[in-house]
């Protein structure tokens, strides 16, 4: 399953999202959701404990001036990569 988080993690039900995530799922953080990937942040630790692969949309990171603050452990994807992830997964859940 491909999960996308496009709102600030402070405005999302992260607990519900984690309950629905399974091994092999991917999560792409977009729009204000990219703030969840800030290094040493509360939400980064929570998301990294899930059995998923975590990505940020690089254009949204750049638009918010956060390029130097995103954890190195989080994958960066372009719009083309995002489309590839969409094709990879049969379903998608938007948060």
Swiss-Prot record:
A Pfam family hit: DsrH
Positions of transmembrane segments: none
One GO term (biological process): tRNA wobble position uridine thiolation
The keyword tRNA processing is assigned to this record: yes
Locations listed in the record: Cytoplasm
Keywords annotated in UniProt: Cytoplasm, tRNA processing
Keyword Cytoplasm: yes
GO CC terms: sulfurtransferase complex
Source superkingdom: Bacteria
Family membership noted in the UniProt record: Belongs to the DsrH/TusB family.
Assembly description: Heterohexamer, formed by a dimer of trimers. The hexameric TusBCD complex contains 2 copies each of TusB, TusC and TusD. The TusBCD complex interacts with TusE.
NCBIfam families reported in the protein's UniProt record: PRK13510.1, sulf_tusB_dsrH
Purpose: Part of a sulfur-relay system required for 2-thiolation of 5-methylaminomethyl-2-thiouridine (mnm(5)s(2)U) at tRNA wobble positions.
Name of the protein in its database record: Protein TusB
Gene that encodes the chain: tusB
């Amino acid at each position: 399953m491909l999960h996308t988080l496009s709102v600030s993690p402070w405005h999302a039900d992260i607990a519900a999202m984690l309950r629905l995530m399974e091994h092999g799922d991917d999560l792409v953080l977009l729009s204000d959701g990219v703030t969840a990937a800030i290094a040493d942040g509360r939400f980064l630790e929570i998301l990294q404990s899930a059995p998923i692969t975590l990505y940020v949309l690089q254009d949204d990171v750049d638009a918010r001036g956060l390029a130097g603050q995103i954890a190195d452990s989080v994958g960066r994807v372009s719009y083309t990569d995002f489309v590839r992830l969409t094709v990879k997964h049969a379903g998608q859940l938007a948060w």
